[in-house]
């Protein structure tokens, strides 16, 4: 007859620490998938994407960007028409771009800086200058939003 392993305080402490490490690992992975999802163009999906779907979408997006870079060197294809979400600030955000930095383990981290300020200036082929009528509504300056995950 096999002996039952005795449950000791040492074993329960080890198990508790291992469980806490696993919870932390899963939390970090979920945070990294959220960062990746927010870097993708707006999606037609109505429900939350699974991890596999996020990876497939990211792979497809990287391939499209790569193909665009190859094709654009030989033609006059405009990045603004192919990838308008990058230049127009139409990124999908679950929390309206209000996020807290992730707390990752020391030595590891994810950083994502998304700002229209860092993109090249928007230049249309034939700029149209509209004639504006004076209004009494004050116009506030636009501010850039920086999202950082560490």
UniProtKB/Swiss-Prot annotation:
Localization terms from the record: Nucleus
Annotated region described as Disordered, given as residue ranges: 1-24
Residue ranges of every copy of the bHLH domain listed in the record: 13-65
GO molecular function, one term: protein dimerization activity
Alphabetized InterPro entries for the sequence: bHLH_dom, E-box_TF_Regulators, HLH_DNA-bd_sf
Region: Helix-loop-helix motif, residue numbers: 27-65
PROSITE patterns xrefs: BHLH
Keyword terms: DNA-binding, Nucleus, Transcription, Transcription regulation
GO terms under biological process: developmental process; gonad morphogenesis; positive regulation of distal tip cell migration; positive regulation of gene expression; regulation of transcription by RNA polymerase II
Reported consequences of knocking out the gene: RNAi-mediated knockdown reduces expression of alpha integrin ina-1 and ADAMTS protease gon-1, and causes defects in migration of the gonadal distal tip cells (DTCs).
Biased composition (Basic and acidic residues): 11-24
Region entry Basic motif, spans: 13-26
SMART domains: HLH
One Gene Ontology cellular component annotation held by this UniProt entry: nucleus
One Pfam family linked to the record: HLH
Quaternary context: Forms a heterodimer with helix-loop-helix protein hlh-2.
Role, per record: Transcription factor which binds the E box motif 5'-GCAGGTG-3'. Involved in migration of the gonadal leader cells; distal tip cells (DTCs) in hermaphrodites, and linker cells in males. Positively regulates expression of alpha integrin ina-1 and ADAMTS protease gon-1.
Name of protein: Helix-loop-helix protein hlh-12
Source organism of this protein record: Caenorhabditis elegans
Annotated gene: hlh-12
């Amino acid at each position: 007859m096999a002996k039952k392993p005795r449950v000791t305080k040492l074993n329960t402490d080890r198990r508790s620490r291992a469980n806490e490490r696993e919870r932390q690992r899963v939390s970090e992975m979920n945070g990294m998938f959220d960062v990746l999802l927010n870097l993708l163009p707006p999606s037609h999906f109505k429900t939350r994407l699974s991890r596999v779907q996020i990876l497939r979408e990211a792979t497809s997006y990287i391939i499209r960007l790569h193909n665009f870079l190859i094709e654009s060197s030989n033609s006059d294809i405009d990045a603004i028409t192919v990838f308008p979400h990058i230049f127009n600030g139409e990124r999908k955000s679950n929390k309206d771009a209000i996020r807290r930095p992730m707390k990752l383990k020391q030595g590891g981290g994810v950083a994502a800086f998304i700002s229209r300020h860092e993109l090249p200036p928007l230049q249309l082929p034939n700029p149209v200058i509209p004639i504006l009528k004076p209004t009494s509504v004050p116009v506030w300056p636009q501010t850039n939003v920086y999202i950082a995950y560490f």
